[in-house]
UniProtKB/Swiss-Prot annotation:
GO terms for cellular component: intracellular immature spore. Its main location: other. InterPro entries: Glyco_hydro/deAcase_b/a-brl (IPR011330), NODB_dom (IPR002509), PdaB-like (IPR014132), Polysacc_deacetylase_ArnD (IPR050248). Residues 57-237 form the NodB homology domain. Belongs to the polysaccharide deacetylase family. One of its GO terms (molecular function) is hydrolase activity, acting on carbon-nitrogen (but not peptide) bonds. The gene is pdaB. This is Probable polysaccharide deacetylase PdaB. It comes from the Bacteria. Necessary to maintain spores after the late stage of sporulation. Might be involved in cortex formation. It is an enzyme of class 3 (hydrolase). SUPFAM superfamilies: Glycoside hydrolase/deacetylase (SSF88713).
């Protein structure tokens, strides 16, 4: 029997609630507009993550980039000006190929890079062979840019299923979703983006933001977001660091 594992970190008291929610939603893909499930695994099952330790004060600002020429550099400038040297950028490799200088700066500034595949296709609609082909192409592109040993994957379009998780496991990727959605790509207004993040954020959260050209208000919202995170006593770390010291417990969803 195939098994799909759902983890939640250090919240044993919420285990029953998590199991009920997971059973109710297990047949659905994970999309940007949906409330994400806590999806984790042991070494014996598919692996994904949406949140770190809830008892921690660490959080992770993550930025997706799949297209555009105008937003990434200003966002990097804003992060640097506000003392953030450890964000996590999930890059489409086709975009990275066209912007080698920006990729080099992301690394130089101290940020972590994760993959969003190559062609920004919906992996949930692809056969395993097609997913592997795209992952291989992305891996080759990143290696040519000097970015090696990428360990994090955020599936293109934000959608994934059991098959995607299984293929990602074969490549030793940890699939990363998010627990706080800024909705910045919808350009709802600077104050709304700030509220979407700061009104619900807590320890362990992975925050979804964008540095593609579609996200026109993110740069302006960032200083207030960072300031309010600090006021709450929260500290930004890379996703890699966020999950590195996690003490997780598992529950099986069949």
């Amino acid at each position: 029997m195939n098994h799909f594992y759902v983890w939640h970190i250090k919240r044993v008291k919420q285990l029953i609630i998590i199991l009920i929610a997971a059973f109710a939603a297990a047949s659905f893909f994970y999309i940007q507009r949906a409330v994400p499930l806590p999806v984790f695994s042991t070494d014996t099952g598919p692996k994904a993550i949406y949140k770190g330790e809830t008892d921690s004060k660490d959080i992770s600002l993550t930025f997706d980039i799949s297209w555009g020429d105008e937003r990434a550099e200003p966002i990097l400038n804003t992060l640097k000006a506000n003392g953030i040297k450890n964000a996590t950028f999930f890059l489409s490799a086709s975009w990275a190929e066209r912007h080698p200088d920006t990729v080099a700066r992301i690394v130089k500034d101290g940020h972590q890079i994760g993959s969003m595949g190559y062609a920004y296709k919906n992996y949930a609609n692809l056969e395993s062979s097609e997913i592997k082909k795209d992952m291989n192409r992305a891996q080759t592109a990143f290696e040519k840019l000097g970015v090696k040993d990428i360990q994090l994957l955020r599936p293109p379009t934000g959608q994934f299923n059991k098959n995607v998780l299984k293929v990602a496991k074969q490549y030793n990727y940890t699939v990363v979703h998010y627990s706080v959605n800024s909705q910045d790509w919808t350009n709802p207004g600077v104050e709304k983006i700030i509220d979407n993040v700061t009104k619900q954020v807590s320890g362990g959260d992975i925050i979804l933001l964008h540095a593609s050209d579609s996200a026109k208000q993110t740069e302006e919202a960032l200083p207030d977001i960072i300031h309010q995170l600090k006021e709450k006593g929260l500290k930004n770390v890379t996703v890699g660091d966020l999950i590195a010291n996690s003490d997780a417990k598992s529950a099986e969803v069949k």
